[in-house]
């Protein structure tokens, strides 16, 4: 057990350190892309003119309250050092791994060597640089926070449902509600956390005859209210007519997205066909894991319900991404930002398959096959992304030069990745006025 634990510790610390080093080598303290949509709010806050409603303002069909709070705190206490915000993304990823370890240890029934080896593989995936876009764009911290809060909520609710008196309310239950709210107000993908939790409560009643009337009534009411607040005046981002008339493309999009959660980029580009092929393989693993779950003895099934719901979460996230992004083309499924939301299914399937291995060579072989695929692609993704560090740093430093030059033109919008020139110009003035981000002397002493 000691050796297996050391392997896990090395994987966790090593993968986390690699992500931190990659950020330090590939990113600069500069505002670009969707971050521009939040800078005027930061200026209002520092000038004492912030309206509370601005925290809840829609942004790209999301209501990122958690992100807004992080940016305001960073501006107040850290001069909006966006590199540090990116480091916080790594902390969220590590926290997700720790949550899974803590809540899933009972599933392995004392087989700690197996548990630590399996979770070492999962760690390599969850901290893989296949998510480079989320590690290197500060506001994409919402992808990591959404998954952290969602996983915590689902597993807390599972522990509540394991109690003999699960019809009552507990600290775990209220913790699950709180984390559901944080996931929801991180980004749009968090809307699936209440959905999965409701399914979890319903399965607990249907499979185990748990008395969950109070639990489901209170949860649905609170989650429904939070969802209503979130969706109010948000605007529709899903073209259902288009999606329903392009079902073949939708299936390709979903398969490519599932595969993309593990495969990563090669020479700074995705290989769509490889994503689809691996997506088919992962889909088969999910089917094996799901079918076996419903055939488990009741005690094992009850212990595994939380992880089974994590499997559903990642699949549902990919389906939601497909509904909202299919009109952009099947290739959009291979965007590295989405991998953070969907890889939780891969981790859940690996855990489930590994716990099925007792007395079953078939599931042992499937677990080894899946684990081997995860390790191979995680290592390749890290290697491929490490080759891009110099180019990405040069790109970020070029953005700094554009902003410091002061004469920002229409032609610069493409480089700064934001369509509204007024946002960029006014935001740049906010940064200058308050000494934020690239204009902070302490974090940019060489400028």
Spans of model-derived segments:
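Hydrophobic transmembrane alpha-helices of multi-pass, membrane-embedded glycosylation machinery
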Residues: 191-208, 224-227, 353, 358
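Intrinsically disordered, polar/acidic, low-complexity terminal segments
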Residues: 2-66, 71, 75-119, 170, ...
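Transmembrane alpha-helix segments characteristic
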Residues: 117-126, 220-228, 298-325
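Extracytoplasmic catalytic-loop and juxtamembrane helix elements of membrane-embedded
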Residues: 28-48, 137-140, 230-257, 306, ...
């Amino acid at each position: 057990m000691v050796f297996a634990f050391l392997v896990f510790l090395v994987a966790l610390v090593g993968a986390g350190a690699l992500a931190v080093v990659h950020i330090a080598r590939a990113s600069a303290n500069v505002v670009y892309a969707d971050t521009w949509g939040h800078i005027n709010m930061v200026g209002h806050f520092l000038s004492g003119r912030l309206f509370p409603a601005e925290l809840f303002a829609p942004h790209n069909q999301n209501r990122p309250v958690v992100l807004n709070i992080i940016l305001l705190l960073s501006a107040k206490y850290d001069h909006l050092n966006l590199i540090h915000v990116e480091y916080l993304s790594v902390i969220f990823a590590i926290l997700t791994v720790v949550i899974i370890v803590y809540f899933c240890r009972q599933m392995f029934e004392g087989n700690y060597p197996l548990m630590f080896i399996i979770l070492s593989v999962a760690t390599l995936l969850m901290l893989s640089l296949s998510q480079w876009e989320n590690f290197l764009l500060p506001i994409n911290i919402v992808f990591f926070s959404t998954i952290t809060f969602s996983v915590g909520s689902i597993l807390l609710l599972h522990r509540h449902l394991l109690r003999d008196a699960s019809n009552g309310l507990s600290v775990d239950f209220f913790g699950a509600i709180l984390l559901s709210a944080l996931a929801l107000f991180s980004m749009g993908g968090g809307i699936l956390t209440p959905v999965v939790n409701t399914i979890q409560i319903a399965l607990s009643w249907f499979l185990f005859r748990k008395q969950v009337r109070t639990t489901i009534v209170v949860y649905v009411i609170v989650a429904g209210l939070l969802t209503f607040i979130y969706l109010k005046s948000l605007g529709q981002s899903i073209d259902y007519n288009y999606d329903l008339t392009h079902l073949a493309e939708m299936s390709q999009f979903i398969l490519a997205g599932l595969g993309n959660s593990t495969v990563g980029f090669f020479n700074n580009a995705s290989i769509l066909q490889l994503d689809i092929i691996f997506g088919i393989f992962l889909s088969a693993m999910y089917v094996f894991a799901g079918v076996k779950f419903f055939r488990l003895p009741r005690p094992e099934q009850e212990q595994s319900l939380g992880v089974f719901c994590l499997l559903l979460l990642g699949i549902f996230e990919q389906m939601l991404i497909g509904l909202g992004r299919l009109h952009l083309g099947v290739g959009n499924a291979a965007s590295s930002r989405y991998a953070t939301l969907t890889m939780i299914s891969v981790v859940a399937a690996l855990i489930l398959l590994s716990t099925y291995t007792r007395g079953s060579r078939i599931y042992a072989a499937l677990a080894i096959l899946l684990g081997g695929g995860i390790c191979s692609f995680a290592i390749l993704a890290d290697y491929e992304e490490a080759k891009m560090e110099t180019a990405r740093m040069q790109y970020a430093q070029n953005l700094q030069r554009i902003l410091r030059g002061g004469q920002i033109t229409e032609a610069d919008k493409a480089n700064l990745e934001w369509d509204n020139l007024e946002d960029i110009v006014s935001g740049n003035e906010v940064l200058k006025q308050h000494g934020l981000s690239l204009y902070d002397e302490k974090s940019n002493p060489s400028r």
